[in-house]
């Protein structure tokens, strides 16, 4: 009788163990099934979250899994999140991609960029009547965006240097607003004499009448360069990388869904990109002493 009870007890424990393992494995599988997306915080958190909503829904449909948007506190956090595979897909600026590529030892892959990113530009703005060209910035105060921003810091700094202006020596003071919209606000409020930012954010503010162009105006637009992209870690299976790439390339303004996503992403369409496209940005960063 005791042997029978012992056998039953052993079988019951085995069943409970298997059940517990099954629950645990299911929990892990569910966690792994969540596809995580992040983006550099180049605009306000509420604006970034708003822009992400229809794209997240679209990716859920394409991938067949739950997709979550994961906000980050700064540009460096977005780099670390992808390099450490805490997220699956990241929206980077060109410089942020270069930083992630170096930080990961070449283990990140840019998939697509907006057509606009093949010929992106930065813009310098001011509310001062005394500033009409770059040389007029000498002795003035200037706001960049984030230190890791391509269009809000690296490339504006690079073009200033090319014009014979060293921001650290020739300007009265430089500031970092943290985001493009914050740069506009700093110029409009008179906190700084001028600001450098992403041209698409400036154009959106002008179109939406969020800035008084009778007071704040653009006075210099940079030459073009490659900028933003959607990037993944090389550990992502090739089949999933292709699925993501095809999903972005398939977005069209001819469908309601595509039109909404593209409008929020400020894109006419997405095109394939590659690491080699960002060599000039890497060189500019090295020349400006911004690569660590």
Residue ranges and their predicted role:
Residues 42-45, 116, 126-131, 145-152:
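Short coil/turn segments
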Residues 130, 140-239:
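Pocket-lining segment of extracytoplasmic ligand-binding domains
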Residues 32-96:
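Extracytoplasmic small-molecule ligand-binding "clamshell" domains
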Residues 13, 21-30:
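C-terminal segment of classical bacterial N-terminal signal peptides
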Residues 1-9:
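N-terminal secretory signal peptides that target proteins for export/translocation
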Residues 32-39, 43-54, 227, 231-292:
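An extracytoplasmic/periplasmic, membrane-proximal ligand-sensing/linker region
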Residues 76-90, 103-104, 135-138, 179-200:
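Short helices/loops that flank or line small-molecule/ion binding pockets
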Residues 110-133, 230-233:
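Hydrophobic/proline-rich hinge and linker segments of small-molecule sensing/allosteric domains
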């Amino acid at each position: 009788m005791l042997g029978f009870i012992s056998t039953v007890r052993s079988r019951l424990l085995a069943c409970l163990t298997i059940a517990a393992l099954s629950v645990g494995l299911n929990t892990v599988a569910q966690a792994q099934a969540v596809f995580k997306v992040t983006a550099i915080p180049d605009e306000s958190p509420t604006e970034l979250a708003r822009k992400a909503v229809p794209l997240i829904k679209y990716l859920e449909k394409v991938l067949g899994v739950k997709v979550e948007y994961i906000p980050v506190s700064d540009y460096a956090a977005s780099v670390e999140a992808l390099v450490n595979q805490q997220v699956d897909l990241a929206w980077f600026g060109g410089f942020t991609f270069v930083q992630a590529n170096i930080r990961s030892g070449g283990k990140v892959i840019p998939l697509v960029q907006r057509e606009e990113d093949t010929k992106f530009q930065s813009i310098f703005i001011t509310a001062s009547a005394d500033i009409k060209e770059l040389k007029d910035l000498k002795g003035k105060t200037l706001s960049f965006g984030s230190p890791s921003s391509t269009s809000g810091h690296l490339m504006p700094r690079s073009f200033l240097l090319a014009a014979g202006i060293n921001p650290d020596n020739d300007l009265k003071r430089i500031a970092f607003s943290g985001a493009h919209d914050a740069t506009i606000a700093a110029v409009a409020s008179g906190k700084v004499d001028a600001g450098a930012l992403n041209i698409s954010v400036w154009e959106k503010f002008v179109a939406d009448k969020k800035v008084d162009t009778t007071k704040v105006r653009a006075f210099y637009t940079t030459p073009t360069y490659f900028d933003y992209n959607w990037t993944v870690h090389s550990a992502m299976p090739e089949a999933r990388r292709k699925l993501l790439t095809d999903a972005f390339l398939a977005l069209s303004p001819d469908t309601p869904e595509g039109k909404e996503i593209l409008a929020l992403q400020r894109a006419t369409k997405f095109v394939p990109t590659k690491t080699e496209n960002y060599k000039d940005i890497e060189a500019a960063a090295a020349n400006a002493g911004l690569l660590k």
